[in-house]
């Protein structure tokens, strides 16, 4: 009995389970180069080795947008001026061997990026206003973690043994080891049916990347059984959890300086606290009022507001899934798929820990501060606060934050306190907070998919439902702003509202909630055949959507109602508003067109291609797919020679969605050359 399948013959990167990056390029499956084949023991053992070596470059062609410069997201932007940002040497090799009904498959890869490993970056050229990076004090270098993840690496990807048997006239196949799953039908958008394998964004960004290098294999036992000629069942159990590797801090496409590899410190610019920097150092050294000490305010008003601690990883067990696929011959041999997966989050939410901080004696600090402040310092503090020196002196004796004066500030983040005592408490609290990446466990996914043909078109679609999807609540800067503006009350043992949660000393903040979520995808791959002067031409279109239910998507903050953060992570405290936050419904589409001219010259084939991506309505949650108004396109040309040598050049432009689009100034040109044997 033969297990039937209607899977499409085209692959795309990052394809199934991939990131929804606007610069996605189709990696078409052309004819494969002849691998090195071998056999032993009178052909009882056979196998092959398939190797690809490549060289690639990525060039920034758009200058830095000075408005794209948040202190906790801007390392990647400041690190690279226009010019070469990545130069990669890479090798990937596949080994497969089989004996009778059994076999083994191993894939390994290694790369080296000279721009990360051997060069200084351009941070100092762009350091205006002056801010520390995650590499401080060596701001023009990359962190050790970034160098390891994005600069060089060598690892085994897939590594599994497999077997094929007949059990009771039913064909059975099984795999044991590190493997990639290909469930569902979606191509360009994540959070669909195929959710088992994480994605390595550092690999995806490398010039010349391939989907087989981007999807992270997971350790699992899986099997497939042909129950009937038309019905099959597949199941797996995963015993080692792995996370998605987002762009490391300081790399060209990085979106966060905190919650990716290489992040260590959250900062805020608090110029109102500059006059208190020396006073804080002196009082904390003397142990006044329980001040813990630590990094103080630098001359530009930059202050540490949290340390980034080790991840809170999900457990290794408890991830499993089952799928049934049915070929309905009476419906034009349409394939239907039905899925269930229980998995742990691959992308993090924010966790903050206040448990190690014991608080302050603000009365003792106020007494010392009042005597220590010179008239010059008092004038500077009063000027920053916009009040008279007499008014400042009136509140110096008050150890708590004056709410009337606080409300008078036009920028709550950069004017967190209105008196010296509150300012000293703010500096101290910020030195003690620890934030971490938290990966939520036990997410359930129920899915349905179909795949059929209509004339020359392959038509596909899928629907996934998660009754308990974790999504972020507050934007990063709103969490930090809530902390800073209420630091004196918190230090005094009071209860404060941070990101909609009532917390006090000793508490933890889990910045997520669970909601019902539906994700849909509908698309087609159309083969035009010889058309418009091409020997072959095909197009791809995919429409995707996200729908959140079972929650109002808003929370009560310290100063009114806020909506949950959107995909752009724009904060209310930084001037973003309701239109920038999450919506219950969000939509986007991707279009691809590619043609081929065969044998243009002496065995050389040319394949021009174009990709257009548009998020046309609604904002996703923080780890979703869509930012309303965001657009991108890529145009390029691929040349291949005798199915072994390939070269490609492409141009990508990102635009739309205003300040929410963190990639809006990352236009680039990429080129690569590959040789397979």
Regions found by a protein language model. Give the residues of each.
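Outer-membrane beta-barrel "beta-signal"
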Residues: 665-677
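Short loop/turn motifs that connect adjacent beta-strands in outer-membrane beta-barrel proteins
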Residues: 34-49, 60-64, 95-104, 162-174, ...
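Detector for outer-membrane/organellar transmembrane beta-barrel domains
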Residues: 86, 341, 348, 460, ...
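Transmembrane beta-strands of outer-membrane beta-barrel proteins
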Residues: 47-55, 104-108, 172-174, 233-235, ...
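Membrane-embedded beta-strand positions in outer-membrane beta-barrel channels/transporters
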Residues: 48, 90-94, 158-160, 220, ...
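Transmembrane beta-strands of outer-membrane beta-barrel pores
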Residues: 55-61, 110-114, 118, 178-182, ...
